[in-house]
Amino acid sequence: MAESLMDVKRRIDSTKKTHQITSAMQMVSTSKLNQIQKHTSTYQVYASKVESIVSHLAKAHLMSASAGVANSNSNTISVSELLAQRPVKKTGLLVITSDRGLVGSYNSNVLKQTNDFMRTHKVDADNAVVLAVGGTGADFYKKNGLNVAYEYRGVSDVPTFKEVREIVKTVTSMYHNEVFDELYVFYNHFINRLSSGFRAVKMLPISEETFEQSESDNRKAKDSRVDVGPEYEMEPSEEAILSAVLPQYAESLVYGAILDAKTAEHASSSTAMKAASDNAGDLIDKLNLKYNRARQAAITTEITEITGGLVAQE
């Protein structure tokens, strides 16, 4: 009985330590979530304005005869190349996951839904080019034999434009060199602190579908949209302005996806750690009850034995 009591006591102490760790991790994740949400609200205003300008100019450019394929000898990607459709031989998959675990179903949801997308669109190991942001996705696709052409690990808790520029530069360069002919971005979209939803967004080539998805994402910032109607005269030219703004738009698409995914990651981590803390608390209560009952039984047994001994002596 003494050993049993010691075992239960040991489990109680161990569970209390786990409870302290998960509670601390929950507070850290909640703090990160609050911090990144401030950046998200600022980004939405910026993204809405950029999208409004680019949407007007690019849609006109898409309908014009000048939207041909860029010169393949150029080392930089042009506006026409970003907008022009071409035969699809390879499909790029930019998959955003976390670098670590302890985030609930966050990673498994992204990977499962991405695999479903691949099956639906007939994308397999032969024609898929994976670009992984986050170690979990990179390791998963390497293990499953897919071509992981690029991976970026260690994204900040609050991602910066500097990080995104490096990713966008690599992605557009690969697109320019025809490593893939279209690019989709896959990530978890933050809905609220308790839930998130999977997103699959076509990034390249930039099309009307891209603008429609971007407009939907930036609904909350619609009051700050810039009205760029035909009454505005563009200087020096629409092409020059589009050349300057379109790369920023591509950056904002990727930055928005990573920011959204990170927000969902912190929310998922906070929720998972809260559930773990609650479960640990429940287990501690059950173990305390078990310990007290075992201790009470041991005391009762000892009293019974003492009483029996006294009676025997009489």
Swiss-Prot record:
Places the protein is found: Cell membrane
One GO CC annotation: proton-transporting ATP synthase complex
Coiled-coil residues: none
Molecular function, one GO term: ATP binding
Record GO biological process: proton motive force-driven plasma membrane ATP synthesis
Entry superkingdom: Bacteria
Membrane topology: Peripheral membrane protein
Entry keywords, A to Z: ATP synthesis, Cell membrane, CF(1), Hydrogen ion transport, Ion transport, Membrane, Transport
InterPro entries recorded: ATP_synth_F1_ATPase_gsu, ATP_synth_F1_gsu
Family affiliation: Belongs to the ATPase gamma chain family.
HAMAP family with a match to the protein in the record: ATP_synth_gamma_bact (MF_00815)
PANTHER family associated with the record: ATP SYNTHASE GAMMA CHAIN, ATP SYNTHASE SUBUNIT GAMMA, MITOCHONDRIAL
Described purpose of this protein according to its UniProt entry: Produces ATP from ADP in the presence of a proton gradient across the membrane. The gamma chain is believed to be important in regulating ATPase activity and the flow of protons through the CF(0) complex.
NCBIfam families with a match to the protein in the record: ATPsyn_F1gamma (TIGR01146), PRK05621.2-1 (NF004147)
Quaternary context: F-type ATPases have 2 components, CF(1) - the catalytic core - and CF(0) - the membrane proton channel. CF(1) has five subunits: alpha(3), beta(3), gamma(1), delta(1), epsilon(1). CF(0) has three main subunits: a, b and c.
Name this protein carries in UniProt: ATP synthase gamma chain
Organism: Lactiplantibacillus plantarum (strain ATCC BAA-793 / NCIMB 8826 / WCFS1) (Lactobacillus plantarum)
